């Protein structure tokens, strides 16, 4: 199974100035059973990349066309020659419409922020379209999932279509029974 992860256009997948999405993708990729089948696509000018399976999409910026559209088109050029079975899109619901026109892979969209503030998921119609065009929608909290669901009746959506994956890939156990020592 070939898996491609498409980062947001301005996300740095580098140890310098990495954003929350890059850190999440790096951590989950390292622990994934599919890590050898994953390619991560992004656009950064920094040389030190987190992982060797990162592919930098060099694009020429344009004042006449959306740089995000140019970025997605560049990704689709790779997909033409080495098609993915599954594509993860992080935090860019507006990429979905463009990807579904030219691709047959299963799409999974991750929401790391409030869906109602993002281009491509602000309106109920846009969110309904995302439900129809994606295989899964993943949220980083129950709150962001509930924001996405605003305006839908609970019977309109398949329950297994929406999942919550918290941003921590390591579970830390805290012993609350351990008593603090009083030093005073």
Pin down the residues of each PLM region.
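N-terminal strand-loop element at the rim of the active site
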Residues: 7-15, 24-67
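Short His-centered aromatic/hydrophobic patch
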Residues: 89-95, 111
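Membrane-proximal helix-turn-helix segments that form the acceptor-binding/catalytic region
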Residues: 27, 75-77, 120-139
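An amphipathic, basic-hydrophobic alpha-helix
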Residues: 62-86
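Alpha-helix capping/helix-boundary segments
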Residues: 46, 93-95, 143-145
């Amino acid at each position: 199974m070939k898996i491609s992860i498409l980062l947001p256009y301005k996300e740095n997948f580098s140890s310098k100035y990495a954003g929350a999405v890059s850190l999440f993708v790096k951590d989950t990729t390292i622990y994934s059973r599919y890590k050898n089948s994953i390619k991560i696509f992004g656009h950064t000018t920094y040389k030190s990349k987190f992982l060797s399976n990162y592919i930098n999409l060099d694009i020429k910026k344009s004042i006449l066309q959306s740089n995000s559209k140019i970025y997605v088109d560049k990704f689709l050029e790779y997909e033409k020659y080495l098609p993915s079975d599954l594509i993860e899109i992080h935090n860019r619901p507006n990429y979905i419409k463009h990807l579904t026109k030219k691709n047959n892979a299963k799409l999974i969209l991750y929401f790391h922020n409030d869906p109602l503030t993002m281009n491509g998921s602000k309106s109920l119609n846009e969110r309904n379209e995302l439900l129809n065009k994606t295989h899964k929608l993943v949220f980083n909290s129950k709150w962001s999932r509930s924001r996405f669901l605003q305006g839908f009746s609970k019977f309109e959506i398949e329950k297994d279509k929406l999942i919550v994956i918290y941003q921590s890939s390591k579970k830390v156990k805290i012993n609350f029974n351990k008593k603090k020592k009083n030093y005073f």
